[in-house]
UniProtKB/Swiss-Prot annotation:
Function: Protein modifier that is covalently attached to lysine residues of substrate proteins, thereby targeting them for proteasomal degradation. The tagging system is termed pupylation.
GO molecular function terms listed in the Swiss-Prot or TrEMBL record: proteasome binding; protein tag activity
Record remark on domains: The N-terminal unstructured half of Pup provides a signal required to initiate unfolding and degradation by the proteasome but is not needed for pupylation, while the C-terminal helical half of Pup interacts with ARC to target proteins to the proteasome.
Cited NCBIfam families: pupylate_cterm
Stated family: Belongs to the prokaryotic ubiquitin-like protein family.
InterPro entries registered for this protein in UniProt: Ubiquitin-like_Pup
Protein name (record): Prokaryotic ubiquitin-like protein Pup
Skewed-composition ranges (Gly residues): 1-10
Sequence position, cross-link Isoglutamyl lysine isopeptide (Gln-Lys) (interchain with K-? in acceptor proteins): Q72
Subunit structure and binding partners: Strongly interacts with the proteasome-associated ATPase ARC through a hydrophobic interface; the interacting region of Pup lies in its C-terminal half. There is one Pup binding site per ARC hexamer ring.
Organism: Frankia casuarinae (strain DSM 45818 / CECT 9043 / HFP020203 / CcI3)
Annotated spans, Disordered: 1-41
Modified residues (Deamidated glutamine): Q72
Length: 72
């Protein structure tokens, strides 16, 4: 009786290699996402600080203008 090689062993090895590649890609993507998140967080913090500064200046001007017009 002749045995037939279906090549299943090779296919399993290929799938295993693909799984390893997928895990490596996920790790790379996760680190890229983490770096991007940190950069965006820094940008948002900077923007919020700038907004706070503008609001403080405008609040002082508003109060000065209100008092000059006779407001209490």
């Amino acid at each position: 009786m002749a045995t037939r090689d279906s090549g299943g062993g090779q296919q399993r090895a290929d799938r295993r290699a693909e799984e390893i590649d997928d895990v490596a890609t996920e790790d790379t993507s996760a680190s890229d996402l983490k770096e991007r998140h940190e950069k965006l967080s820094e940008d948002v913090d900077s923007l919020l600080d700038e907004i706070d500064d503008v609001l403080e200046e405008n609040a002082e001007e508003f109060v000065k203008g209100y008092v000059q017009k006779g407001g209490q």
